[in-house]
Every structure is written in structure tokens, then in C-alpha cells.
């Protein structure tokens, strides 16, 4: 099976994603990993039989990711990249790592209608309740864990 994994960060060094991808490769699947790059890294690379595709990002997109479910700029920016990734690798299923990029994947997938697995590594809405910057102005009024 051709599996598209979506990660909203650099790769490597995420061991949870790497271990999961390697397990899928070892089980006979073809894994294509969408990830971001912030420097001069290879756009396409084979790492431990994981087909890594890196898409250029920047500090502004990174900061906008905190507002992904408040103001959808990040979602709109990522949707375009993810749509291109899906069109290029032609997966049979999409595996999303983490909630920040999930809405962008759902929107990008509307025209493909592929099955999606959402793997929430962390309960981000609960974790966000502990962030000091979300307990005071302006974070308290801009970012709502309930929306996540």
C-alpha cells in the first residue's frame, strides 16, 4: 500500500514518526513523508526506505500554526503544499501526525477522497491549557483550546 504520512515539522529527527514509518516499510508498504524544511535541505530524499518530501516553510508559517484553528492562514498555506504532495505521490491512504496540520489535510483531500488516519500523538487541547502564554493577554483571547 502507498501511504502518505503528513508531518508539520522537519524530518529527521522525529523518532516517533521515524519508528512508525520504518515499521510500515518493514511490513511491505511504500511510505511517503510530507514534512517541512526551513533551511537548504534536499527536497526529495530516501531515509531508511522512507520517501521524504520536504516543502519550504518559514518562521511566519511556523508562528501562524499556533493560530491554525483561530485564523486559518496556516491551514490555507499548508493545504496548497499538501494538495501538491498528494497529487505527486498518489497515495492510497493518508496518515496525519498531529492536530495542527489536520484541517489543511482534510481540505486538501476533498478532491481526492482518500481514507485518513489522524494520529494524535499528544492531546494538544489539554496541553494548551497549561501554556502560560495562553493564560494571559493576548494569547488568552486569541487562541482557544476549545477550538482545537
Residue ranges and their predicted role:
Residues 34, 96-97, 119:
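Structural motif
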Residues 57-68, 117-148:
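Acceptor-binding helix/loop patch of EC 2.4 sugar-transfer enzymes
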Residues 8, 99, 123:
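Active-site beta-loop-alpha junctions enriched in small/polar residues
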Residues 13, 41, 62, 103, ...:
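Generic structural signal for helix capping and beta-alpha/helix-loop junctions
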Residues 3, 94, 116:
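Receiver (REC) domain switch-region micro-motif
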Residues 48-53, 112-113, 133-137:
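Short, hinge-like loop/turn segments at secondary-structure boundaries
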Residues 1-41, 46-51:
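N-terminal subdomain of nucleotide-sugar transferases
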Residues 62-94, 100-113, 145-148:
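An amphipathic, basic-hydrophobic alpha-helix
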Amino acid at each position: 500500500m502507498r501511504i502518505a504520512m503528513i508531518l508539520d515539522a522537519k524530518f529527521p529527527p522525529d523518532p516517533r514518526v521515524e519508528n512508525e514509518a520504518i515499521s510500515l516499510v518493514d511490513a511491505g508498504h511504500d511510505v511517503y513523508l510530507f514534512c517541512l524544511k526551513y533551511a537548504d535541505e534536499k527536497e526529495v530524499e530516501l531515509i531508511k526506505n522512507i520517501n521524504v518530501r520536504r516543502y519550504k516553510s518559514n518562521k511566519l508559517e511556523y508562528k501562524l500554526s499556533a493560530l491554525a484553528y483561530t485564523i486559518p492562514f496556516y491551514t490555507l498555506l499548508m493545504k496548497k503544499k499538501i494538495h501538491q504532495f498528494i497529487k505527486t505521490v498518489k497515495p492510497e491512504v493518508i496518515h496525519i501526525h498531529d492536530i495542527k496540520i489536520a484541517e489543511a489535510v482534510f481540505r486538501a483531500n476533498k478532491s481526492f477522497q482518500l481514507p485518513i488516519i489522524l494520529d494524535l500523538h499528544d492531546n494538544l487541547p489539554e496541553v494548551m491549557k497549561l501554556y502560560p502564554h495562553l493564560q494571559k493577554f493576548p494569547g488568552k483571547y486569541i487562541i482557544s483550546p476549545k477550538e482545537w
